[in-house]
Regions:
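Sec/Tat signal peptide C-region and signal peptidase I cleavage site
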Residues: 15-19
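N-terminal amphipathic/basic membrane-interacting segments and domains
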Residues: 20-346
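Sec-dependent N-terminal signal peptides
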Residues: 4-14
Length: 346
């Protein structure tokens, strides 16, 4: 059946069709353009941050010389949940396959489908779908502190002496910045741009040398995705698990604590009676999605709560064939829900 769908979808995108009679698809029914309406799957994205700490070479002297408390001398790596997002995604519904048969008394033209056979547009081209993008935190490059060590620091005979001299250099850098900012330096920058350049360079030196005491903390975001099929009465289903040491884990990995998802139908659209469903479908069939309230929680706290379109909670309707007689009607569908986004007439 899939081969038929893809072959016919290519036909739809390249060759105009004079007219159509749309009906539920049955294999072997004859020539035509087969398309699917989507059903909803919930896409759960968990953005987690991996935090790695590497102690500095002079960490044991951090409190003594720089009054920095609680500086660890042990490397550490752990994870945090940054945020959770849930969105609706459409996948072909095998129970909603339709065929557009050719006939002579309609002005319906090209039919555009997705690669999966979902309907996108009739008599026009659907706009390009924007890819899902997240601004993720990435590890920053750190300056090599040895670039800013004085000769006295480099030839120091002991770690303790090196720590003492490095701390003095840090205080000298701070004093230089203060003198410049107060306008008390022997040689002042000529303009604001020069001033900023000097301050930025002094900040870079101070940060690099301070890392010898405070250590380096690197943060990196990762996106973990799980898919859930919506169903009425979905409550506290384990979608993924999370461990501070291991990060985001599959739902069946008991090394992490569960992340739960719940779904509640909101004002579902009445389902069409069976006798009306059996009526001949004359026109383009599309979805009217219902709505669902989605909640994701972890350790008793809500991480995400929102309303999303759910096709399983809605119904289907027919865009009557009369719209395509004698006039050119353009229709754009939402391939994620199968609903109509826009209708234009020439």
């Amino acid at each position: 059946m899939n081969k038929t769908v893809f072959a016919l979808s290519m036909l739809a995108c390249t060759a105009p069709v004079a007219a159509q009679d749309i009906s539920a698809y049955m294999p072997g029914e004859g020539e035509g353009i087969v398309y699917f309406l989507p059903k909803t799957t919930l896409k759960v994205n968990i953005i987690a941050t991996r935090i790695s700490y590497k102690p500095g070479d002079l960490c044991q002297y951090a409190n003594q010389y720089l009054r920095m408390n609680n500086v660890s001398s042990e490397p550490e790596t752990y994870w945090e949940i940054k945020r959770v997002e849930v969105c609706s995604a459409g996948v072909p519904d095998s129970t909603k396959a339709y065929i557009i048969k050719l006939k002579d008394k309609s002005a319906m033209g090209n039919v555009e489908l997705t690669n999966e056979g979902l309907i996108k547009a009739i008599n026009t081209s659907a706009p390009e779908e924007k890819a899902e993008e997240y601004v993720l935190e990435k590890p920053q490059k750190h300056e090599n502190p040895r670039k800013y060590m004085t000769e006295d620091i480099l030839i120091a005979g002991s770690t303790a002496k090196m720590a003492e001299l490095t701390a003095k250099e840090i205080y000298n850098i701070r004093e230089s910045k203060n003198l410049i900012l107060r306008g008390q330096a022997d040689t002042m920058p000529k303009d604001g741009a020069s001033l900023q350049l000097i301050i930025d360079n002094l900040d870079k030196q101070e940060k690099a040398l301070t890392q010898l005491f405070a250590g380096i903390t690197a943060r990196e975001d990762k996106v973990f995705t799980a898919y859930i099929t919506p169903e009425e009465g979905l409550e506290n289903k384990v979608v993924l698990r999370f461990s501070n040491l291991l990060g985001v884990l599959p739902a069946n990995d008991l090394a992490g604590e569960p992340i739960y998802i719940s779904l509640k139908s909101l004002a579902p659209i009445p389902v069409m009676p069976e006798d009306k469903k059996k009526k001949k479908l004359e026109g383009a069939i599309y979805n009217i999605p219902g709505k669902g309230k989605v909640t994701v929680s972890y350790q008793g706290k809500t991480c995400f709560e929102g309303e999303l379109p759910i096709t399983q909670f809605g119904s289907t309707e027919v865009l009557v064939d009369d719209l395509f007689k004698k006039i050119n009607t353009h229709v754009i569908f939402n391939p994620e829900t199968g609903s109509i986004l826009k209708i234009d007439k020439d």
